[in-house]
Structures are given as structure tokens and as C-alpha cells.
């Protein structure tokens, strides 16, 4: 018993600290709703969007962002399965008359262009953000993310995830309908 009493308590601190870190990491992984994090952009003017155009004549300018009516800004990529899942809904929304600006992030330009040619282009203009800087400025965690913008260029709502399913119906659609009725 003499050997056990000589082990300093400080030797156990790294083990306790490690267990604490593992627990905190595990709890962080359990948060699966990116929409639970409020956007700091709500009520603020929309940040600038990359001046890189995905194709000629598709620059998203501040003037376009402040044009009349409700607009959506959708961050997407051709390699993103949830982006593919929401594409039909974006086409429907665009067909209804809402202007949608796209920001293609961390994608190959040719793949993005091919995707829009094959499946249809719901965007009035599309910015190309190969390094993800615009996405960072907007606080995008992963594509797809969609922002509702008013005619003053102010961010009204942020929706993380595809525009499909129950979350779309219960969270995005009411915010979108409210924005349309208040324009």
C-alpha cells in the first residue's frame, strides 16, 4: 500500500481532463440541427457576394440585392446530395416569380455549369465562390443554405439544409410566406 499512496493526485488530472474533452466533443456531435444556431445576419444588410460569375452576365450585385421584392440567396454545390434534393423546389419557387440568387461554393466550375444545364437553372444570377470566402462571410456551415432577403437588402431569415421535408414545411415556408405578405 505504500506505493499507491505515493502517486501524486496531479497524475490523474490529465486523464480527468481528457475524459471531460471527450464528453464535451460527444455532446457537440449530438447537435444535429444547424438551424438551432441563430444567424448574426438577421436584421442586417446582406454581406457582399463574390464578384466571380459562374457564367458571363451572372454577377450578383448589391443593386440586385436591393431590387424590389423578396429574394432568396441559395448556397449550393453540384457535388452536394442535399442540394440536388432541393433543386426541384428551387425551380418551383423561381417559377412562382421569386428571384433566387445562387452562390456556388467550393465546386468545379464546369461541373456546376453542367449541373445547371442538365437539371435547369432556378437562379437569376449565380456567383462562383471556389474558396468559400463568401460562404464564410455569410456564416454558411455547409450547403445548402438559403437566406430570405427583403427589398432593402436586409437578411430576414436563414435556413440551413435542403428545402424539402418537415423542417422546410414547418420552418422555412412560414418565414417565406410571412416575408411575401409583408413586402
Where are the regions that the model predicts?
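N-terminal targeting signals for export/organelle localization
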Residues: 1-52, 183
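Aromatic-flanked redox-active Cys/Sec active sites in thiol-based oxidoreductases
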Residues: 74-79
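Short gly/ser/thr-rich secondary-structure transition/capping motifs
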Residues: 31-32, 52-59, 126-129
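A short beta-strand-turn-helix
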Residues: 49-72
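Hydrophobic beta-strand anchors of alpha/beta hydrolase catalytic cores
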Residues: 72-73, 100, 146
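A generic structural signal for alpha->beta connector loops
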Residues: 43, 48, 97, 123-124
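Thiol/disulfide oxidoreductase modules built on the thioredoxin-like
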Residues: 7-11, 118-122, 129-183
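Structural microenvironment flanking redox-active thiols in thiol-disulfide oxidoreductases
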Residues: 84-120, 130-137
Amino acid at each position: 500500500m505504500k506505493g499507491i499512496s505515493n502517486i501524486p493526485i496531479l497524475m490523474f488530472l490529465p486523464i480527468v481532463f481528457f475524459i471531460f474533452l471527450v464528453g464535451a466533443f460527444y455532446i457537440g456531435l449530438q447537435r444535429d440541427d444547424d438551424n438551432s444556431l441563430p444567424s448574426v445576419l438577421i436584421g442586417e444588410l446582406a454581406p457582399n457576394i463574390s464578384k466571380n460569375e459562374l457564367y458571363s452576365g451572372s454577377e450578383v450585385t448589391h443593386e440586385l440585392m436591393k431590387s424590389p421584392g423578396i429574394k432568396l440567396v441559395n448556397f449550393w454545390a453540384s457535388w452536394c446530395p442535399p442540394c440536388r434534393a432541393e433543386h426541384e423546389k428551387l425551380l418551383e419557387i423561381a417559377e412562382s416569380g421569386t428571384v433566387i440568387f445562387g452562390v456556388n461554393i467550393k465546386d468545379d466550375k464546369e461541373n456546376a455549369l453542367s449541373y445547371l444545364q442538365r437539371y435547369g437553372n432556378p437562379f437569376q444570377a449565380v456567383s462562383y465562390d471556389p474558396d468559400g470566402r463568401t460562404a464564410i462571410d455569410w456564416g454558411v456551415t455547409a450547403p445548402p443554405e438559403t437566406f430570405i432577403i427583403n427589398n432593402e437588402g436586409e437578411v430576414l431569415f436563414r435556413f440551413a439544409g435542403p428545402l424539402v421535408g418537415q423542417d422546410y414545411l414547418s420552418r422555412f415556408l412560414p418565414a417565406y410566406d410571412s416575408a411575401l405578405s409583408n413586402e
